[in-house]
Amino acid sequence: MPNFKSKKIKEINLPYSKDDVEFLWFAKNDNVSLIYTKVQEESFFLQIKKAQNGFVIKGDKHTKPSKIGYLQKALKIFKEGFCEDIINEAFGLKNNALIEKTPFIVDNFDELLSKLQGKIYIEIGFGSGRHLLYQAKENPNVLILGVEIYNPALTQVAKLAKAQNVNNILLIQSDARLLLSVLKSKSVEKIFLHFPVPWGKKPHRRVIGKDFCKECARVLVQNGRFELRTDSFEYFNFTLEQFLTFPAPKFSLRKNENLEISSKYEDRWKKQEKNIYDLWVWNFNQECQNYELNEFNLSSVEFSKEDLKKIEQNFKNITIKKDDFFLHFESIYKQDENLLLKVAFGAFNKSEHCYLHLDKTIDFAFKEPFKIQENIKAINELKEILKVQFKI
């Protein structure tokens, strides 16, 4: 991630703005300061962390913007305005950095859902985008939705789509399991998962699992198809076993079949003479219904100044685990007389991180997490823990 190291930080007087970058307020604890930053339509934190002989300034990994150019620009402006004696830097704002809003990248699920219509294919972990762009060109009347956890991949593929005049794609940074959980039932024609990380020694980290397979069955249309392509026979066999739990699925199994398009990983494996396995699955016959989304209802929580002092004094790094969700209180920061709380929460296999701003009331510092049931339960638990565990 882009960053730089400085020996000295000048006094930070906010708000401060320059060249479409705004630094609005900051919160801090003993080790870290967070600068609330806006670049055009996106908000995120810059993080200042004490280090040996200076400070490291970088983007907060849980709020980083969808376009790396936004972060690079914010770092440049902060360095010029507030830092002295730069020790080193690992970022550079290039003239061709993708800073302007692109129609190919959506920033959140609400924006995504508003743009979904017609036939939809999903590619999970599209990487360099070769297969995704190929599908888009071959199927101009289909919307190709790419989900990827790495920001640089989104930026790269958006640039390629623009250069190649491909207009039927949408890209989002997300965990694929979380994405599937917010889609309507029977709304997707195909789901591609090509060369996922096998996680041989940590199978619990695989995207494939019973819940994932159920979600695939729910969102796929009648005779919609899931397609896995992998060089790992263990992963291939594991995936087959997961889908065999359905009543009457149909499968197509293939080995070392050449497709019209080859990813860079596939090219590498073929040079090493590795076997390539394909698994297609359809005919799930799954009874499905769309989930009813509830609200977080944070308006029911109110704080006095004394309450905030008690929360700050009694704060502990604790984790609460329930049957289908967890809640982890990670860090607390002071912002004038108010507090900023960092928590991780949600389902065990699709957790989220967020910052909560506490003054007279409580609210999300950035956009709301999506309203899946595990997140709703975790936030309800948080409201109770604030009262009981932190003695307000």
Curated annotation (Swiss-Prot):
It catalyses: guanosine(46) in tRNA + S-adenosyl-L-methionine = N(7)-methylguanosine(46) in tRNA + S-adenosyl-L-homocysteine. It comes from the Bacteria. It holds the Pfam family Methyltransf_4. The keyword Transferase applies. Substrate binds at K201, D231. InterPro entries: SAM-dependent_MTases_sf, tRNA_(Gua-N-7)_MeTrfase_Trmb, tRNA_methyltr_TrmB_bact. It is an enzyme of class 2 (transferase). Catalyzes the formation of N(7)-methylguanine at position 46 (m7G46) in tRNA. NCBIfam families: PRK14121.1, tRNA (guanosine(46)-N7)-methyltransferase TrmB. HAMAP family: tRNA_methyltr_TrmB (MF_01057). This is tRNA (guanine-N(7)-)-methyltransferase. It comes from Campylobacter jejuni subsp. doylei (strain ATCC BAA-1458 / RM4099 / 269.97). The lineage of its organism: Bacteria, Pseudomonadati, Campylobacterota, Epsilonproteobacteria, Campylobacterales.
